[in-house]
Amino acid sequence: MRLKNNQAYFVKIAKKKAQKFIKLVKKNYPKRIILHNKYQIVEDNHYIFFPLKISPDKINELRKKIGPSLEFEIIKLKAEKRENYEHRTLEEALKGQISKNYYDLIPHSYDIIGEIAIIEFKNNEKMKKKRKVKNKIAKAIIQVNKNVKSVYEKKSKVRGAFRLRKMAHLAGLKGTETLHKENDCIFKLDIIRTFFTPRLNHERLLVSKSNIEKGERIADLFAGVGTFSVQIAKLHDVKIYAFDINPYAYKYLKENIKINNLKGSIIPFNINIKKLINPPNQIEIQLRNKIDRIIMNFPEDSLRFLDVACNLIKEEGGIIHNYQFSEKPNSIKKAIAKFRNEIESYNFIIKEIKRSDIIKSYSPKSDMIVIDAFIEKLNQS
């Protein structure tokens, strides 16, 4: 009983016996779903046809369990999908839509930012000329995820001082601006003009819920659209100085300060933070050695900006949340060594490492590392 495309196995049963059949199914299969809710139930004048969700080798089992109590037939019919049916997996949504040769290209994960899904195809060589396959996979993502309205494909690595990547529209609405909800905060952003990754959700929650004291002065040196700053100020009565070089990120940062009900305050700056100290300007003079805590979420090159951090942090000590990409193996140990060497060159020392961890594997050769360290100026004790 081999199935053709768009066919399924159905139980054909007399209408007057349909209710008894349903009861027997529930009794004999209490923990299994054997009726397929993807397809419409069919009926004619005398019979009802129930679509089955079991493999051919289980049909005899069904006959043995229910057949003695009830007369029915197993037949093949063209299956019509229910209009309100919601696919649970991409594989299910793509069944019969793409060749099985491309099943290995269906992504196991993808980012969802607001109403936009962002997908990356691992085997780009195989997919380069397969626009139709990409489009079908993208449409399947929209089918599986209720809130997704658009799908974009990553077309480059994150690059440049603004940390942006090229994207290509695959399916759904065209538009790169969205509202993203995270940890009781709302972030307005543009996926092409600003940097944002939902994969640091847990890390941002950890930092925002850490032991931050009332009245702290905090510098967020690479604030982006405010993902760290807003979440911290949402929970704590603090003053945050949030810097970003990208004018679009700065625009959205200001909007996100307004749309979130904050306990603390955030002062945004659109500036290259190197310009705080080369030469010193009014902002740096105001903040020099007055900052209690510094966030350095720029893993590609954060160590190069530790001169700015050491210039701002209190000489008697403060906390730096430093993020870096570090080579495997022993990536944490190597990251700490690089961090220590760099701050010592500015006459600071590590008094305590409060946390050091692998945030994620960034590539086959490197990890993304976080170091939460209390540092102070030499000769303070």
Model segments located where?
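SAM-dependent transferase fold signal centered on methyltransferase-like domains
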Residues: 1-381
